[in-house]
Amino acid sequence: MGKLTKNQKLAAGKIEAGKAYSLKEAASLVKEITFTKFDASLDIDVRLGVDPRKANQMVRGVVSLPHGTGKQVRVLVLCTPDAEAAAKEAGADYVGLDEYIEKIKGGWTDIDVIITMPSIMGKIGALGRVLGPRGLMPNPKSGTVTMDVAKAVREVKQGKIDFKVDKSGIVHTSIGKVSFTAEQIRDNAKEFISTLNKLKPTAAKGTYIKSIYLSSTMSAGIKIDPKSVEEI
């Protein structure tokens, strides 16, 4: 391992080994230990007491973060011509149908979210090999297959994100930027964890939220005491 930089040493000195911080403390601390020249993303990792291999213990959902994600989300709407104007007005970056389907078949995926209509899904099914591995396939459960594409665009632009537990039982997502205030970070984290609690599978036994870590793009993870989330 290479030598630590001056900033890395400063950051390491601020985190007490083995300590579980309150969410309030962690939201302030993550700003103190991030020294990037760019506006780093803030990530949260929550380990759940579930077995994702079992269908009745899969955790997947959507959450609208109170303060958004701070990211510019590029949205493609695949829709019928009568819905195009509303989608554009709502803020979609790309709107169309056949021309974008052909672009995607050719490997174009320079987007973050695809929103479409139920009547269009038949055409999109063939794109699964391109979109699936990148997590871009529209899904009714995440609200990206809908008759009201304009509403879906507004929600995504305002900070609605979808998430699911991975094979090792961890849910990972971004909840903002390091430029956010500590209060905004706390609000977003609390809303996300509250949503996870509501999605607890009835088949899950024992401790549900096993651990929570908050970090920025270039920082170490800060361990959070799950009990502290409800204290704010």
From Swiss-Prot:
GO terms for molecular function: rRNA binding; structural constituent of ribosome; tRNA binding. Keywords: Repressor, Ribonucleoprotein, Ribosomal protein, RNA-binding, rRNA-binding, Translation regulation, tRNA-binding. InterPro entries: Ribosom_uL1_bac-type, Ribosomal_uL1, Ribosomal_uL1-like, Ribosomal_uL1/biogenesis, Ribosomal_uL1_3-a/b-sand, Ribosomal_uL1_CS. GO terms for cellular component: large ribosomal subunit. Coiled coil: none annotated. Gene3D superfamilies: 3.30.190.20, 3.40.50.790. Pfam families: Ribosomal_L1. One of its GO terms (biological process) is translation. Binds directly to 23S rRNA. The L1 stalk is quite mobile in the ribosome, and is involved in E site tRNA release. Part of the 50S ribosomal subunit. Belongs to the universal ribosomal protein uL1 family. This is Large ribosomal subunit protein uL1.
